[in-house]
Amino acid sequence: MKLTDHGVFLCGGVPKQTAPLTPDEGRRRTMAYRILQAHNQSGDERQLRIRFDAMLSHDITYVGIIQQARASGMKEFPLPYALTNCHNSLCAVGGTINEDDHVFGLSAAKKYGGIYVPANQSVIHSYAREQMAACGAMILGSDSHTRYGALGTMAVGEGGPELAKQLLRHTWDAPLPEVVLVYVTGTPRRGVGPHDAAIALVKATFASSFVKNRVLEFAGPGIAKLPIDFRNGIDVMTTETTCLSSIWETDEETKRFFEVHGRPEAYKKLSPEDGAYYDRMIELDLSQLEPMIALPFHPSNAYTIRDFLANAQELLAGVEAEAKKRWPKANVHLLDKIHDGGVWADQGIIAGCAGGMFDNIDEAAQILRGGSVGSGYFSMSVYPTSVPVSLALTRLGVTESLLETGAIIKPSFCGPCFGAGDVPSNNGLSLRHTTRNFPNREGSKPGEGQFAGVCLMDARSIAATARNGGRITPADELDYTPERHPYQFDKTVYARRVYNGFGHPQPETKLIMGPNITDWPRMYELGEHLLLELAAVIHDPVTTTDELIPSGETSSYRSNPLRLAEFTLSRRVPDYVPRAKEIAAKEAERREGSNPSDILAALSRVGDAEALLNTTQFGSCVFANKPGDGSAREQAASCQKVLGGLANICYEFATKRYRSNCINWGMLPFTLDAGTPFDYAPGDLVFVPDVRKRLEKGCEDFPAEVLRQTGEKAELLLHVKGLTPDERDILLDGCLMNYYAKRG
């Protein structure tokens, strides 16, 4: 894979350094530009204000989104909005609370005119592909893996407040992104699947932020040779590159997809116009790809399986060392997986929006046919991505074949991807064709001494491994001839079970709210000055949203902001919640007119404490080098806010969506200049004078003072760059809900 970090033109279907066009003229010839401008309401091509064609949320986000929109005056859903139930669908934690969310979702779909997909019918992104994607369309989802570029749809994953804005008939605002050409050539060899291509792409781009907040535009002769499931499998993983969105050329294969799904009108031919200009380029030669493995704790920590097996001792020792550093309570050992001439896994999982597609499961079954998973410690589970896919596999005999080998077929459920299904054993090594292998995302609890490792692999190599009883094996080492079967979609599945009320709201319908569904607590506007106490200081290279607010069983409480907030940073900084609560209690005392001695003492170090007390807002703050990689979950920010969080300080944000979440929840997204030392500790204070006035004026620099617990003081220059006028007002008002409430 070759990366080019300067502009290129696509002329006659071939990348070139020059063309008889200016770059600005060429930019207007990309697919991405044309789709974005078709949805842009601003009148300014460089400052987008996008209205989407449709939206989707699953059952750990839609309750909070609807609650935000209700509180801001929403009366009906103004665009198709699908509510899927693919995360807390086991209903195994918290008594009735998970099914209570589902009942709320159906009542909301009826009241406001939405689409309700019952539990286990489909994972969110499969339903979007099957029923909502269309060439030239744009879809917004409250899940980071909202990616339907291979179907000609530009899709964006964002936190819940951005969806609430659309429900209130407002726009998604962003500067015009740069576009990166992914020029695809070659044909994958036997045994190489979409996850191999995707993992290789993430490895090549993530660490350098090569495509961060940019759009990936896939073109080139190699696309025509890829089945649509293969394309979708690469596309959904582009999220892990930190790109903003994606779009692919469409062709006869795309057309067949829409015809099979009974939506031929959704197809149209998309391709870059001759002379299209791209800010960067990635050359992806499919013929050079090998079966890949991504080791803990990130999809970019990737190697060819062959290289991994040749260097397993060294590589697993490195994973062990990192795990022991992160979780000293856990008795981590992975090196014992190396024995009997191989590396042995304990579990194989094919699941979710990346793994559970028809072609992946079909070819995995072909590899396993006539073999056995065995009767040892290794187990294998397969989760088809939707009931229509499961039904097609059953009718073809694939389900029967897999069951005969000892694999288990499970429902359409996202659990293995976020820690709510098939949690491995302590010190277990799980191979997964899912999207992520972040720390603890598989469900282990390091605070209780638990550890498990997840490696990402393609379904084909997982099947090859299963055939060998758990000995990690690349699929291209097996002698088999894959046979591609046509997919038959049965539209009656959704016709019988999915409630589609778009355009037909029933305002008289009463929302059904279980006891766990609560309103958001009161949030206050920004003070004249800020006094921030560091409640967590994290120096890891990247901090994921899974660390900021764990998934798995904690997701069951996402309809209850205060209850969920109890889990904030619980697996990374266990002291954060009690520390943040203590800070919030002091701020509550200040608001009630008391004079907390700690706050007075701190303010006396920067000025007249009595004069500053009534105008200085006191709250907690998290420092992390690069926070927000991973999920779109707004709760990574809202839980900090609920606990009294007022800011994040970092060198850069890992993703736009996490920064947007911070802004929408009224937390100042402060950044530091690269190289600025930050050797402060929890309990140290940061005083930001005149923060409100400077924000109102549009200032981007915020001089601050750090008050160490040792009595020392230090100057610190903070930045808040690139805010839109609306974002400034949201921060001033304290959060998005306050912003809308203030404006009626």
Place the predicted regions along the sequence by residue.
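Fe-S-dependent hydro-lyases/dehydratases of central metabolism
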Residues: M1-G744
